[in-house]
Amino acid sequence: MALDLRIGNKYRIGRKIGSGSFGDIYLGTNVVSGEEVAIKLESTRAKHPQLEYEYRVYRILSGGVGIPFVRWFGVECDYNAMVMDLLGPSLEDLFNFCNRKFSLKTVLLLADQLISRIEFIHSKSFLHRDIKPDNFLMGIGKRGNQVNIIDFGLAKKYRDHKTHLHIPYRENKNLTGTARYASINTHLGIEQSRRDDLESLGYVLVYFCRGSLPWQGLKATTKKQKYEKIMEKKISTPTEVLCRGFPQEFSIYLNYTRSLRFDDKPDYAYLRKLFRDLFCRQSYEFDYMFDWTLKRKTQQDQQHQQQLQQQLSATPQAINPPPERSSFRNYQKQNFDEKGGDINTTVPVINDPSATGAQYINRPN
């Protein structure tokens, strides 16, 4: 990628920071203001171009909480380009940062926002169809506690936005999305509807609690055979077994989503209340203190203590008051490798939770 490529005569392309279902994502800079943005590029020679469609979906969803704002779309040289808000790390990156386990409090804090994001997308007559940790990114700066949903390359309208006429029930459909989090009906080839996005979210929440899902790492010679094995394991694992060791609300959630009929409107408020009531019974405080926030704070405090000790060692005759915490960003690279070999991510993490800068990531494909 040429580093001097300009997008819309206003944005300079930088290094690659991630990949979506269709196209790669680069760090960009507004050459006038210096503001950093994310730029998604797709070759104009792509066999099945999707970026313009994704841009149209973003436009329809524009203004929703946790929906990134698109600043520019057009063709530049041999690329379709979309310029949008720069966001922080994905939930998959943060999961790795937290040693691949989230506390119950963090899972419940996330569940509340994630259900709301899906509800908003559905209210605009769209399905996401690829609900997974990689497609949820935290904000930066003042919006650092807000979960954002991205990657609408596989999104699909499930009803007419005026008449609300639902798409027809169909079978023999190919699997769309990510097999690990796909609903059972999606595996069975049934047309996706609202229930499927929510079932996928259920698997994401259980994944965060458990650290992995029973159908991860299954061996097969072809992709089709692997999908079949995942489906068989998913069907044969009762929700009570899948959620064993965790509050029954997770099993109740999954059983509810699986009980919905094709064109049913889910009761999003009921699902949120399910987890909010559990949150209250656990006497948690709604303070946005996620696991990664606490870990960064611990790292920051340790670093501050080390700096203080170094100062005292260097000047034993004069004991000075500890320096004020600086606002610089200290990036720390860590490589994480998920068992099964499908993730190998370098995640530069900001140790200062109050930092206003972006956290650049290389997201898994």
UniProtKB/Swiss-Prot annotation:
It comes from Schizosaccharomyces pombe (strain 972 / ATCC 24843). Residues 343-365 have a biased composition (Polar residues). Belongs to the protein kinase superfamily. CK1 Ser/Thr protein kinase family. Casein kinase I subfamily. The gene is hhp1. GO terms for cellular component: cell division site; cytoplasm; cytosol; mitotic spindle pole body; nuclear chromosome; nucleus; spindle pole body. The keyword Transmembrane does not apply. The active site is at 130 (proton acceptor). Residues 301-365 are annotated as: Disordered. GO terms for molecular function: ATP binding; protein kinase activity; protein serine kinase activity; protein serine/threonine kinase activity; protein tyrosine kinase activity. GO terms for biological process: DNA repair; endocytosis; homologous chromosome segregation; meiotic sister chromatid arm separation; positive regulation of double-strand break repair; regulation of DNA repair; regulation of linear element assembly; signal transduction. It is found in: Nucleus. Keywords: ATP-binding, DNA damage, DNA repair, Kinase, Nucleotide-binding, Nucleus, Serine/threonine-protein kinase, Transferase. This is Casein kinase I homolog hhp1. Involved in DNA repair. Has a probable role in repairing alkylated DNA and may regulate the activity of protein(s) involved in double strand break repair caused by gamma rays. Residues 11-279 form the Protein kinase domain. The keyword DNA repair applies. Its EC number is 2.7.11.1. ATP binds at residues 17-25, 40. Residues 301-311 have a biased composition (Low complexity). InterPro entries: CK1_Ser-Thr_kinase, Kinase-like_dom_sf, Prot_kinase_dom, Protein_kinase_ATP_BS, Ser/Thr_kinase_AS. It catalyses: L-seryl-[protein] + ATP = O-phospho-L-seryl-[protein] + ADP + H(+); L-threonyl-[protein] + ATP = O-phospho-L-threonyl-[protein] + ADP + H(+). SUPFAM superfamilies: Protein kinase-like (PK-like).
